[in-house]
Amino acid sequence: MSAANPETPNSTISREASTQSSSAAASQGWVLPEGKIVPNTVFVGGIDARMDETEIGSCFGRYGSVKEVKIITNRTGVSKGYGFVSFVNDVDVQKIVGSQIHFHGKKLKLGPAIRKQKLCARHVQPRPLVVNPPPPPQFQNVWRNPNTETYLQPQITPNPVTQHVQSAANPETPNSTISREASTQSSSAAASQGWVLPEGKIVPNTVFVGGIDARMDETEIGSCFGRYGSVKEVKIITNRTGVSKGYGFVSFVNDVDVQKIVGSQIHFHGKKLKLGPAIRKQKLCARHVQPRPLVVNPPPPPQFQNVWRNPNTETYLQPQITPNPVTQHVQSAANPETPNSTISREASTQSSSAAASQGWVLPEGKIVPNTVFVGGIDARMDETEIGSCFGRYGSVKEVKIITNRTGVSKGYGFVSFVNDVDVQKIVGSQIHFHGKKLKLGPAIRKQKLCARHVQPRPLVVNPPPPPQFQNVWRNPNTETYLQPQITPNPVTQHVQAYSAYPHSPGQVITGCQLLVYNYQEYPTYPDSAFQVTTGYQLPVYNYQPFPAYPRSPFQVTAGYQLPVYNYQAFPAYPNSPFQVATGYQFPVYNYQPFPAYPSSPFQVTAGYQLPVYNYQAFPAYPNSPFQVATGYQFPVYNYQAFPAYPNSPVQVTTGYQLPVYNYQAFPAYPSSPFQVTTGYQLPVYNYQAFPAYPNSAVQVTTGYQFHVYNYQMPPQCPVGEQRRNLWTEAYKWWYLVCLIQRRD
């Protein structure tokens, strides 16, 4: 057997290879171990979103009576582009495969259907139970450290049938999960043998339903499954904002034959639902996990005492270690309970419920009495309607829907009552509102640890500059000795520490911190680009020019890096982080002035102006990044050159490349990115001339790159004779272009 494709368990083969090998195998009377040819069934590829199972079945009806058409979809019900057609009677599959079938003007890919097989357990040589030796004594403390890979020992679980170790490709580690397909098969096999796999238990009288789209609600799905028995509950799984994840569960009151329901075919809104048994995934109990002892790192040497609590220092930064109130062991290092830590609503709900039953309260938050958390709120629901809906449980004191700074609902809120109510009873009930089930839970007020637990860092002021630099101490254009404003904490009289916030312009999209320093402090505005998405201020000051990271605001949308350096001006583009979405202005300083105009990339999307100062003046035109829709020119001066990328923010709305500024005049071509939709040219000045090429990015609509070369620094503020010379040269080139076009 080829080493490139050994017969390992769960190995798969491509459809093309399996088709050829299976055909050869069928002609010789034997079957390959990779898979078996399914009789009277044809593989169909090249299926797009316009094709449904009914149309495909009618298309193949010429070859025989079609038994079933199955289009393979993912978990959300989106077609994967292929499927299978099975026939009732015997048909000549090779004849069908050899024919050419066109559907919706597209040729389908045909082949025999092959059912892939897994090797039986009796053919696999099980490996004996081998336990790695313990680590040397000096590494005993990292034996259970989740952040240490050297001696991290996986939990070894023997196979319940063969008593051998499971395959290393899928070890049964704590908190392991299994996919629904795999769990369905394994659980069915387990149920037939009378034992349950540790990954999860089959939920009786409950069916998994996949392929649910936005048009389906719980009431309709419940009525659809009513033919099999009395439906107890229908639950569509949604995210925190109430948007469906595409699957859910249907539970029945009485005993039903789940296998019979799963084997049936249910079509809903013209779409086939995916059915399977419901499996409740399990995590290993806490008693099976060996807790690691309380180990505290030694304090730093005396010369590093001042950085012990410095949030910008990573060397000796010591996390606060909080023993678990139940086991008295340290929490996992992957989620330490640090000051100001927050917990999610689901985790806090479970932990708070357990805590309340034992008579103590977790430090993360306290349960708010007579208040209920309500999730799954959409834009159609208002506070009055929600209050009337909860009026059956008691006199409603207040309904509060949580919104962002712009007033848009975040999808959840709280309902508080005047009198004492049974919150657990309300949480256990099922409330449907506008045909949608609300998510309920106890309300938990998150807490921050008291200030006495935080070791403040002393007030440290940078030394003043030498005398020869005193004049540049407060010069906003000087980066050498630019001194940040130090604001003491009004309580502790120590310097406030500021942390990095996710999704800020000083970070990449993954949330990793992009260290920036030596800028002036910016004023704070609601919803500005220097704040996080919740509207909290991200104070940044004393920046130096910082490198560009993928997908940062100083790069193009395609993710290619656009290095920016030695600019006063940044490239402006629509929807950039230097604009807000609500229309609040973000003042930027030390630019040359230019007028503001509606709907330009120098403004917010609502049309409010973004005043920028100390730019060279240029005329303003409506609705164009570099010109208006009528073709009037928008001359731009005095930029340093930077590389242009496809789909760059310094391009027109067509997305073609606009290599910037100060070129010598060049001919205008229809549909070029240097023109507006009417074809008028956008003249640019003071670059060396370059020839025009067919199909280049600066001409036709194909978007091919037009290589540019021999950049020069543009002149600064051309005035007087110099300005007249520039316009004279531009006029010469324009006249030459007109002659060329007239000759053509």
Swiss-Prot record:
Any one Gene Ontology MF annotation carried by this entry is: translation activator activity
Q: Name one GO cellular component term.
A: nucleus
Kindly report the protein's main subcellular placement as a broad class: cytoplasm
Pfam families, sorted: Daz, RRM_1
Q: Which portions of the chain have biased composition (kind: Low complexity)?
A: 11-27, 176-192, 341-357
Q: What is recorded about the protein's domains?
A: The DAZ domains are essential and mediate the interaction with DAZAP1 and DAZAP2.
Q: How does it assemble?
A: Forms a heterodimer with BOLL and DAZL. Interacts with PUM2, DAZAP1, DAZAP2, DZIP1 and DZIP3.
What is the name attached to this protein's record? Deleted in azoospermia protein 1
Q: What's the source species for this entry?
A: Homo sapiens (Human)
Its encoding gene is what?
DAZ1
